[in-house]
Amino acid sequence: LFRRMTVAQLAEQGDYRFFYATNRVPGGDASSLATRFGSEREADLKFGVFDTEIRPSLGLGMLIDPTEWFQNEEIRLKEVRSLEQQAFIEQLRGLVESSPHRGLLVVVHGFRERYPSALRKTAFLGHVLDINAPVLVFDWPGNQGSSLSGYRRAREVAHASGSELADTLHLVIREVQPDRLWLIANSMGGQVVADAVHELYREADLADAPVEIEHVVLTAPDVDKDEFNQQFKKEITALARHLTVYVSSNDRALLVSRLINRGTRRGESTLSPD
């Protein structure tokens, strides 16, 4: 199980190291993972690593029903440690250089994700993909509540967080310098990516140079379809070699989003699930 993923493996059997960058405002109690970061956004990026223990029983069922109990039981966060930016760069670069393709996977989660669950789901995704490269999660404060007003606040935060994701990608491209950079985003995380790409596209040295990102994958992106077609597709072509979009015909979050935003979302499928 997970035979390819050796770069991030630690000495202890079943333990793996992942990286994070977040634009959350630090919470009042750094000793507790649940309160280490809050649900507010700020422009300053914080960096770190987190070590996880993955139970051998972990299966694809978590994608279907990723309950808090299941995450806590099957994916245990053993240590979460903050790093200064330079130490973060050096550690991440070291793993990139030791990976077979000098690759790096960047993950952006979606609406309602809290800091601890974002870390656990990142570990889960890395193991399911079984990718032999380091994995970095860009964690943004999408947990603004389950109400309609909470959704609207989350969209505002997603748009604003594009700036910090752009800063993170810029740091990765310039300082870590992976040969292959992959970017995966889910749901409203797709909006964060769209806004980050818009910022990076305006940098001539990035937009006019050879592509910096190998592959961008968006799953059920909560992005306006017209915005996607008229702006994002053009801009991403200048930055990424490949783009894959997975759509859904029965994603309830996208259906609610369409009602709130009064427009079709790019992650919606026109095909009936029946």
Language-model segments: which ranges?
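Short N-terminal helix/helix-N-cap motif within the alpha/beta-hydrolase-1
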Residues: 115-117
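Amphipathic, coiled-coil-like alpha-helical scaffolding segments used for oligomerization/assembly
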Residues: 100, 112-113, 184
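Lipolytic serine-hydrolase domain surface
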Residues: 2-83, 89-99, 119, 123, ...
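Active-site micro-motifs of SAM-dependent methyltransferase domains
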Residues: 113, 190, 223
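Alpha/beta-hydrolase fold active-site loops
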Residues: 103
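The conserved beta1-alpha1 loop
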Residues: 106-110, 220
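Gly/Ala-rich beta-loop-alpha elbow adjacent to hydrolase catalytic centers
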Residues: 165, 185-189, 193
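Flexible, glycine/proline-enriched loop segments at strand-loop-helix junctions
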Residues: 110-111, 155
